[in-house]
Amino acid sequence: LLDGILESGDLARIHLQVYAAELGEGDYTASLNILSGDTIAQIITINLIIDGGELPPILPRYDISSSESGIINLPNDTDPIFFNVANRYTHVISENGDFIPILIQNNFSVDQISHVRNVLESYLVDVEDGEWGSNKAMISNAIGATNAILLLLNDEDEYENPNVWSLMDSGVHGQDLLSTEVFPEGSIEYMNSSHRNATYEEVLHFVHNYGIQIANPSMQNEI
């Protein structure tokens, strides 16, 4: 339920976001009702048509609570489309309890994985009194709803890996990040600034593509 009050002469933009991941094929209708004691009520009809089509594979939510690091090995019964690409898994919880999955190849250390996950979480934390960041719930919820995956790959050779291409061609959305680009604070490479650290950049691409662009059009327009 969306409600609010506009004073006379005020202007507000309302962005409607629809999650269709669990909706079947068909026609759907909703309405936006604008009520006022001083004018005629306005009803704006919203129509949504979902066409049939092949759904992309979806990575199930795995329980990571048994792992001290929050990182687990992928179960052997994982869909081969994912299991042929990565061997470990973790996730970040969105505001509405959905999850944002992270798939991991074997060259990543636990410290590197934790660093990437912490960076993602930091982007989704509210910033009090910030112009755009005071409420990021819709952004984290949008990422979870798209089923997008943060894919941690060993190195550039993985761009020639046919299993990685099969995953992308299946319709799975995501953002890659290489182990050769991740240097946690305190590591030798970080302290010496001897290598390019792309963690913040690539994770921000992930948040932007699957969160900000979907859930916050006003912020996107400013960008």
Model-identified regions with their sequence ranges:
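Acidic/His-rich structured neighborhood in mature extracellular/periplasmic domains
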Residues: 97-223
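Intrinsically disordered, low-complexity boundary segments flanking structured domains
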Residues: 35, 84-91, 134-140
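N-terminal low-complexity, Pro/Thr/Ser-rich intrinsically disordered segments
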Residues: 54-96
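Generic low-complexity segments that are intrinsically disordered, proline-rich and/or Lys/Arg-biased
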Residues: 42-43, 57-61, 76, 206, ...
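Surface-exposed charge patches in extracellular/virion surface proteins
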Residues: 7-17, 42, 60-64, 68, ...
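Feature for long, exposed domains in two main contexts
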Residues: 1-54
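Short amphipathic alpha-helical surface micro-motifs
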Residues: 28-31, 81-85, 103, 129-134
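Alpha-helix initiation/capping motif
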Residues: 19, 36, 65, 72-76, ...
